[in-house]
Amino acid sequence: MSAQTNSGIQQLLEAEKVARNIVEKARQHRTQRLKDARLEAKREIDEYASKKEEEFKKSESQASGIYSQAEAESKKQVQDTFASIETSSQKNSDKVVDAILSITCNVK
């Protein structure tokens, strides 16, 4: 029985060794899957961040164009108003001077 017992023990040791190898391969496979998942998640995050950055720059550019257009329109309105005031003052300056002279010279 000693040989049979040794043979049984050897089979158990071999089975344990095979089981350890299977468990180790499973751990390595799991570790590799986790690494791959992390890399994939990082790639997706970077891709999403890049897309959102591009969208932000596009909307910022559009807003800048709108603000520039509004600023140009405001400047034109101010210039038109000043030109109108200038024209009006040139037209009526003689009348204003005459009115002032009339009031100051005609003392009652």
From Swiss-Prot:
Compositional bias ranges of the Basic and acidic residues kind: 48-60
Topology of this chain in the membrane: Peripheral membrane protein
Gene Ontology, cellular component aspect: cytosol; nucleus; vacuolar proton-transporting V-type ATPase, V1 domain
* Superkingdom per UniProt: Eukaryota
Q: Where is the composition biased (Polar residues)?
A: 79-89
What are the GO MF terms of this UniProt record? Answer: ATP binding; ATP hydrolysis activity; proton-transporting ATPase activity, rotational mechanism
Q: Does the keyword Transport apply?
A: yes
Which intervals of the chain are annotated as region Disordered?
Answer: 48-89
Q: Its GO biological process terms?
A: proton transmembrane transport
Keywords annotated in UniProt: Hydrogen ion transport, Ion transport, Membrane, Transport, Vacuole
Query: Is Ion transport there in the keyword field?
Result: yes
Protein's cellular compartments: Vacuole membrane
Tell me which family the UniProt entry assigns to this protein: Belongs to the V-ATPase G subunit family.
Assembly and partners are described as:
V-ATPase is a heteromultimeric enzyme composed of a peripheral catalytic V1 complex (components A to H) attached to an integral membrane V0 proton pore complex (components: a, c, c', c'', d, e, f and VOA1).
Q: What PANTHER family does the database record attribute to this sequence?
A: V-TYPE PROTON ATPASE SUBUNIT G (PTHR12713:SF11), VACUOLAR ATP SYNTHASE SUBUNIT G (PTHR12713)
Protein purpose: Subunit of the V1 complex of vacuolar(H+)-ATPase (V-ATPase), a multisubunit enzyme composed of a peripheral complex (V1) that hydrolyzes ATP and a membrane integral complex (V0) that translocates protons. V-ATPase is responsible for acidifying and maintaining the pH of intracellular compartments.
Kindly provide the name given to this protein in its UniProt entry.
V-type proton ATPase subunit G
The gene for this chain is vma10
